[in-house]
A protein has these predicted regions:
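N-terminal low-complexity or simple alpha-helical regulatory segments
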Residues: 2-84, 89-92
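Amphipathic interaction/junction segments at domain boundaries or subunit interfaces
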Residues: 54-165, 178, 192
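Short terminal or interdomain "cap/linker" segment that borders an active site or interface and mediates
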Residues: 2-18, 129-170, 178-211
Length: 211
């Protein structure tokens, strides 16, 4: 596939590095190279993004990975791999940043669960806004939180999808919630997606954990 058309909007290199490494863990070097080829990311074959927070991993490159996973493994298989890559990106790259790093402190650990979510989710959104060109907001409702990505890298440039496709973002959120809550799993459903024609990508997070 021809190289992706760059957007000029970026994630930190480190996010791209961890995502690519997490895929290599699951599918091996040859499988990863096939995905990078298919996604137009040949420049990363044997040449991973540097391990730094410089903004250098283009939104279109992240979207290209998602498209390639679906094309090679089908919607269901691609979804599972993308969720895993998203979870790995949080657990390896993000949990030690800023306010999230304090989630292991005793003062935070003893807070009630809903207080942890009220503090942790906006902190997570703020980190994305600080480290990348992704802008996210959080709104609290009675039984759920609404996480909105206003410039979504995961489905950048995609149209005509028949259902939401931002599984990497869903995985990131699932792992962030697990970390912030001290080990609980939460239901995260993408309810709106730019790839299906919506103006934004929106994720509904149930307040009550499923485990």
């Amino acid at each position: 596939m021809s190289p992706v058309q760059k957007t000029g909007l970026y994630y930190p290199n480190k996010f791209g590095l961890i995502m690519i490494k997490s895929l290599e863990e699951v599918m091996g070097k040859n499988g990863l190279n096939a995905i990078l080829n298919l996604g137009g990311l040949n420049n990363y074959i044997e040449n991973y993004p540097p391990d730094n927070l410089d903004k250098g991993f283009d939104f279109a490159e992240l979207s290209g990975i998602g498209v390639a996973l679906e094309e090679m493994y089908g919607p269901r298989g691609g979804r599972g791999l993308a969720l895993r890559a998203g979870r790995a990106t949080f657990s390896d790259a993000l949990k030690n940043f800023g306010a999230l790093a304090g989630a292991a402190d005793l003062a935070f650990v003893v807070l009630p669960l809903q207080s942890k979510l009220r503090i942790g989710l906006p902190a997570f959104a703020k980190i994305f806004s600080q480290l990348s060109d992704q802008y996210s907001t959080v709104e609290e409702k009675d039984t759920e939180f609404i996480w909105t990505i206003h410039k979504c890298p995961v489905c950048w440039g995609r149209t005509n999808a028949d259902k939401p496709v931002c599984y990497i973002a869903t995985g990131l959120l699932q792992e962030a919630l697990k970390w912030v809550s001290g080990g609980n799993e939460f239901r995260v459903n993408e309810s709106k997606c730019v790839a299906v024609g919506d103006a934004i990508c929106e994720f509904v997070i149930q307040k009550e954990p499923i485990s």
